[in-house]
Amino acid sequence: MTNLYPKRTRTKLANKQKMIRVAINLFARKGYQATTQEEIAQDANLHLQTLYRHFRSKEELAIAAAELSVSDCNERFKNNFSHANTFEIWRKWIKSSSSFLLSLGIGEEKRDRLCSASSLMNDNYLLIIYSGYEDLLTHYIAQDFCMDVKIDRLPRLVAGMLWNGNEAAMKRCAGKDTQSNNLHNVNHVLAESLAVVDDIEAVFKGHIKLQRRSHELFSDTHSSSQFGPMGER
């Protein structure tokens, strides 16, 4: 029994991580409301009861998924912030994470949510993850701008623009403003999502005061946890 316990523990942890990763992808592709716990268990090749042993509700799973997604993004920032600014890191994060999820396809449920009058209210995952990404971006933007968030409101304002820019880009691609559905066009969605980051950077880049070394390579490891232009991760 002594020898089996560590193996069982590792298996439980691996199963839990697998379910969280699958949930991140499904929430991004279909939206929180349209994703069922049965689908998550099935895509993770696990029994539904295994999922319930780890997560008593879908909301509990969404919280874990949001925390992991923000943690992945934070690792990207920690690995690159000494030689790249917030806008550069965020742009590459959007590109790599979104490319992965777009390759899996966006469901019609997701498009319907994006075009609805209450798109955020219908997606608990987005509501849960919002504060995590906004806090993360605020932290690094404040360092870039050499500002104190206790005094200056600009870092959180810019962070909110970067985060909400993902939702804005996806709404445009879903036809909210353009009356043309381009969610199936990976290149179009990526271009729209990155253009949002570029537009915000063009306005606020002049506020960057932090000096950096320029000789280091950018760490751009792939992440399967989503957020990117879907507005989730």
Residue ranges of model-derived segments:
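Basic, helix-initiating cap at the start of DNA-binding domains
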Residues: 1-30, 34-46
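C-terminal peripheral helix-coil segments that are non-catalytic and often amphipathic
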Residues: 2, 138-146, 168-233
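Alpha-helical DNA-contacting segments of helix-turn-helix folds
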Residues: 15, 60-69, 129, 133
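Short amphipathic alpha-helical segment with a characteristic S/N-K-E followed by hydrophobic residues
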Residues: 19, 57-62, 72-73
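Residue-level detection of the helix-turn-helix DNA-binding "recognition helix"
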Residues: 42, 56-57, 67
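Short hydrophobic/aromatic patch on the recognition helix
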Residues: 44-55
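Hydrophobic alpha-helical connector segments
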Residues: 75-111
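Amphipathic alpha-helical packing segments from all-alpha helical-bundle domains
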Residues: 118-146, 153-160
